[in-house]
Amino acid sequence: MNRALVLLLYVCTVSCLASSKVILMRNNITLSFDDIEANFAPSVKGTGEIGVVYVAEPLDACQNLMNKPEQSSNETSPFVLIVRGGCSFEEKVRKAQRAGFKAAIIYDNEDRGTLIAMAGNSGGIRIHAVFVTKETGEVLKEYAGFPDTKVWLIPSFENSAWSIMAVSFISLLAMSAVLATCFFVRRHRIRRRTSRSSRVREFHGMSRRLVKAMPSLIFSSFHEDNTTAFTCAICLEDYTVGDKLRLLPCCHKFHAACVDSWLTSWRTFCPVCKRDARTSTGEPPASESTPLLSSAASSFTSSSLHSSVRSSALLIGPSLGSLPTSISFSPAYASSSYIRQSFQSSSNRRSPPISVSRSSVDLRQQAASPSPSPSQRSYISHMASPQSLGYPTISPFNTRYMSPYRPSPSNASPAMAGSSNYPLNPLRYSESAGTFSPYASANSLPDC
């Protein structure tokens, strides 16, 4: 599109400079018409020629002209208006020159709308000759013969050095303007694109509203913990009493001014552990080194196991009275931290039922209560364990610490159960029923 514009401007400039003009001037009327000079006649020089136009007689000027130009007092030259046809252009011009006219204006006899260059022998031709259209000839014919009507023949610059320089200069100026416009438009687009991408690339921080929402504290003393408790990792200055510290979700502390500038202007993670400060969860984000089971999942599994053990202990407690096992409890052994295991031997005869002691009654009452206290739950879990109820366990761990003495129904007496001649290896229990398990921890082993 730019090249087409330059070419059009060039053509218009050349056409304007190459074509000569015929200017009609009368009082307040000024009309301009295009013409083209004859090849065999002298060209118009300088600023042009001014004269008065007359109509030729005969109009085609193929014969000697009957009318003669009138001598004017002012410096105007007589011009003759001739129609095309009947004879050659050269003959018409020679007849006009012989009659005393200074220029011959020949117009077309048909309305073709185009100008043609007249050709002929230039020998002996001393006057100017131009060709105009039929429309221009009709207008000039109306104003012919009036002394106050002037016709100005403007020369053509087609063959002059000035025309070549002017065309070259205007063409160069137009091309330079187009190239400069394209250059500045392209540069402006590149600057806009670069500034937009740089603004997006430079913004890495958080909003001040999110940073101010993080907890802050006033430093009072040094603490031994997992945080940066002595020196700010950003400015490398020691904390002093009264400094305002900002606490990130990863529990690292920094000067409030330092970490606020870091989070809002540079990055959104902790300068120490690289954890994203926009996350408020207690667990760090998952990575390749993250364990399969987190601490939250393990604590949930442990609490579920403790709850199941506690519920099974409460269910066993109320059914103590219906057990056919012979169990004897004494107040001394109820308050002791050791429980002796007794197993009933397999026999066909059933031992007579015995009365349940005070400890068993208390156990049933506490188990039947709707919401036992933590101390009661611990006591119930301890007294209602499978070992204290007489149920044998087949675990290899329990058989290792099982008493070698197996009482039979005939020798199951309180005296024998309370005797110290048969040492037992009881399990040590903890304060809560939820941790009573041989696989819970190493602390459950005896004398560890």
From Swiss-Prot:
Q: Which GO terms describe its molecular function?
A: zinc ion binding
Q: Which Pfam families match?
A: PA (PF02225), zf-RING_2 (PF13639)
Principal localization reads membrane
Compositionally skewed regions (Polar residues) per UniProt:
408-423
Q: Where is this region: Disordered?
A: 344-380, 402-424
Q: Where in the cell is it found?
A: Protein storage vacuole membrane; Golgi apparatus membrane
- The PA domain covers 60-144
Q: Could you tell me the membrane topology recorded for this protein? A: Single-pass type I membrane protein
- Record key words, sorted: Disulfide bond, Glycoprotein, Golgi apparatus, Membrane, Metal-binding, Protein transport, Signal, Transmembrane, Transmembrane helix, Transport, Vacuole, Zinc, Zinc-finger
Q: Which Gene3D superfamilies match?
A: 3.50.30.30, Zinc/RING finger domain, C3HC4 (zinc finger)
Biased composition (Low complexity) is annotated at 344-378
Q: Which GO terms describe its cellular component?
A: Golgi membrane; protein storage vacuole; protein storage vacuole membrane
Glycosylation site list: N28, N74
Residue spans, topological domain Cytoplasmic: 185-448
Tell me which residue ranges form RING-type zinc fingers. Answer: 232-274
Q: Where is the signal peptide?
A: 1-20
- Mark the transmembrane ranges: 164-184
DNA repair among the record's keywords? Answer: no
Name by which UniProt lists this protein:
Receptor homology region, transmembrane domain- and RING domain-containing protein 2
The species this protein was found in: Arabidopsis thaliana (Mouse-ear cress)
In the record, what lineage is assigned to the organism producing the protein? Eukaryota, Viridiplantae, Streptophyta, Embryophyta, Tracheophyta
